[in-house]
Design a protein with these regions (language model features):
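Short beta-strand-to-loop capping motifs
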Residues: 6-8, 65-71, 109-113, 158-164
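Core RNA-modification/binding signature centered on pseudouridine synthases
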Residues: 123-207
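Short amphipathic alpha-helices in soluble, non-transmembrane regions
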Residues: 74-83, 117-125, 172-174
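Short, charge-patterned binding micro-sites
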Residues: 36-66
């Protein structure tokens, strides 16, 4: 099984996960990469993705698995067919369920003053409030925050749970901004993923 690491930046960060699946399928077809198809009445490419990210979050660490054989220049062939903001940057061979195994992600958060308040998320029983399906929800998310550190006054780095126990980084940012009266826009960049505490690229390179 091939595992490909790819980016979703600029306009590609505004593409929903289901449309990303369609885009990757199209890219594989255009690049003439021979991927196995599912059996049944509605066959589709056997692709598996790491946990999806919310719209507007840029990423340089997305992963997709494909039941395909290794080919020469496969990254170049794929990248020749990618839309702006999407590119394939690394290739691995490993049989793995990406969504279940890559269960943490690192993000760079950028917003006015967020570096000065990021330490707050490390408080015991840290609770955030957000709106879900028009209902205000409060949850203790402390068990899903693995690290948080200041980069400078206006940026910070966090490692959060993803996958089955996903914690959306935009909810952390918006809660901090609301609680601390921070104004302005914010930006989030996903920089890497982990299999527990092992960086994804290192894990996928292991025999």
């Amino acid at each position: 099984m091939l595992i490909l690491k790819f980016t979703k930046t600029e306009n590609s960060s505004l593409v929903a996960h289901v449309d990303t699946l369609r885009a990757v399928t199209y890219i594989f077809r255009r690049a003439k990469v021979d991927v196995e198809y599912s059996k049944g009445f509605n066959p589709h490419m056997e692709l598996g993705f790491s946990a999806p990210i919310s719209l507007g979050i840029e990423s340089v660490a997305e992963y997709v698995s494909a039941k395909a054989e290794m080919q020469d220049d496969i990254l170049a062939k794929l990248n020749a067919n990618c839309p702006k903001g999407m590119s394939f940057v690394a290739l691995f061979e490993k049989k793995v369920n990406l969504a279940a195994t890559l269960n943490r992600a690192e993000y760079i958060l950028t917003a006015n003053g967020i570096g000065n308040v990021i330490h707050q998320v490390l408080a015991p029983n840290y609770t955030i409030t957000y709106t879900e399906k028009r209902v205000e929800v409060s949850k203790d998310v402390s068990s899903r925050i693995f690290s948080a550190e200041k980069i400078d006054e206006n940026s910070a780095k966090v490692v959060l749970a993803c996958g089955n126990s996903n914690l959306r980084p935009d909810r952390i940012v918006l809660h901090l901004m609301t609680q601390n009266n921070l104004v302005g826009d914010y930006k989030i960049l996903k920089t890497q993923m982990f299999a527990d505490d092992i960086p994804a690229d290192e894990f996928l390179s292991q025999e």
